[in-house]
Amino acid sequence: MNTSLRRVAVAIMVLIVLLLANATVTQVFAADGLRADPRNQRVLLDEYSRQRGQITAGGQLLAYSVSTDGRFRYLRVYPNPQAYAPVTGFYSLGYSSTGLERAEDAVLNGSDERLFGRRLADFFTGRDPRGGNVDTTIKPQVQQAAWDAMQNGCDGPCRGSVVALEPSTGKILAMVSAPSYDPNLLATHDLAAQADAWEKLRDDPQSPLLNRAISETYPPGSTFKVITTAAALQAGARPQTQLTSAPRTPLPDSTATLENFGGAPCGPGPTVSLQEAFAKSCNTAFVELGLSTGTDKLKAMAQAFGLDTPPPAIPLQVAESTTGPIVDAAALGMSSIGQRDVALTPLQNAQVAATIANDGIAMRPYLVESLKGPDLATISTTTPEQERRAVSPQVAATLTDLMVAAEQVTQQKGAIAGVQIASKTGTAEHGTDPRNTPPHAWYIAFAPAQDPKVAVAVLVEDGGDRLSATGGALAAPIGRATIAAALREGS
């Protein structure tokens, strides 16, 4: 072989090596990035060529796909968008996915390994591939009642969240976040309309894309007194334990004072029982109770209820609830009434109520009842799982009695005839100027008190006037409407 031919052969070999190296880099090392690149139309065309599975609740369709004549073969449809957006999320050409559309994507698009047999059968038979289905724990009647109550609970729409749980299992019966949005606007194949909708939602100061039920934490206010009371009871306090009834009290190690709602004393005498202080939600009494219980016991009890612990996915990701740092006696006093750095998601506060309702046992919350193949054959079912025992049955029973008494002195708008409810309200200051910022209104409850079927947490953000925007006035009627729907569903 002469020199020229050798040079040509070497050049060809070098080119082949370079081509193989480039193919290796592209197919092995860069494959994931290329697949995830939103500019990769082949991936999108492949995904939209398959009929994505359904998301359902109690037989009701929450999300499904319909055939189109366009370049992208299937279009995602959400028939009741606003009420269920926090559950389904969206599936979008330009903005990826959220909610169950994201968490259960492998099942919905058919790529889950448990659907391999179906994919193989489709390949040999020539059937069009289809995704699997997700059946949620949501009860449509409960979800709709909670959504409707939020839309009409504040002389118009409220901003906030409602979560309802089945105490004995941890099933999420309702998960509402308001204001909400229409996922159909982000699922459209009209990319210009999709981008316009995204920009409006992203820039909306009301944050409709935020799932307030699980992605945001809030000061719980007086609803946290349930945990403070649990810690005190476990440490030896009793419902008859006497506490101060003073209208205001100085916070130790500080120049600040803390007062009861409206600046009123808790009772006619110098002291008041824990039972009466709980029912009237007396701040000064609970500062004393928290200080006498101590930081370690309060934080340990909060952790037993699920705070300061990474929460399990439901399968959506949930923000961690926390007591925050309690660095001194003043911080302990404020934390004991659910202020300072204490912050909970509405889901976590619903779990607090559900744990008491379940004799002190905390159940792992979950949103997916079962996963099914395209032929509706079940591929997995969620089994209820105990997370921990938070309090003894005796402490849970005492807390139930205290919460029943508290419900009886709460404003009774929306009361359910013949149903005994155990509850605790809360009015939580927040923001950089809490004295001049409308407080959040809370309500946590379960019913029937002696045979609980449902536990709820209601949060109304920035409820209004400081003296009228209380948990009892705003949040409680929403909670009772949700409870009533759950009890009708179960009857």
Curated annotation (Swiss-Prot):
Residues 160-484 are annotated as: Transpeptidase. GO terms for molecular function: penicillin binding; peptidoglycan L,D-transpeptidase activity; serine-type D-Ala-D-Ala carboxypeptidase activity. GO terms for cellular component: plasma membrane. It catalyses: Preferential cleavage: (Ac)2-L-Lys-D-Ala-|-D-Ala. Also transpeptidation of peptidyl-alanyl moieties that are N-acyl substituents of D-alanine. It holds the Pfam family Transpeptidase. The active site is at residue 222. It is found in: Cell inner membrane. It is a single-pass type II membrane protein. InterPro entries: Bact_Transpept/Beta-Lactamase, Beta-lactam/transpept-like, PBPA_dimer, PCN-bd_Tpept. Residues 30-491 are periplasmic. The chain crosses the membrane at residues 9-29. One of its GO terms (biological process) is cell wall organization. Its EC number is 3.4.16.4. Residues 1-8 are cytoplasmic. Keywords: Cell inner membrane, Cell membrane, Cell shape, Cell wall biogenesis/degradation, Hydrolase, Membrane, Peptidoglycan synthesis, Signal-anchor, Transmembrane, Transmembrane helix. Pathway: Cell wall biogenesis; peptidoglycan biosynthesis. Transpeptidase that catalyzes cross-linking of the peptidoglycan cell wall. Required for the regulation of cell length. Belongs to the transpeptidase family. This is Peptidoglycan D,D-transpeptidase PbpA. It comes from Mycolicibacterium smegmatis (strain ATCC 700084 / mc(2)155) (Mycobacterium smegmatis). The lineage of its organism: Bacteria, Bacillati, Actinomycetota, Actinomycetes, Mycobacteriales.
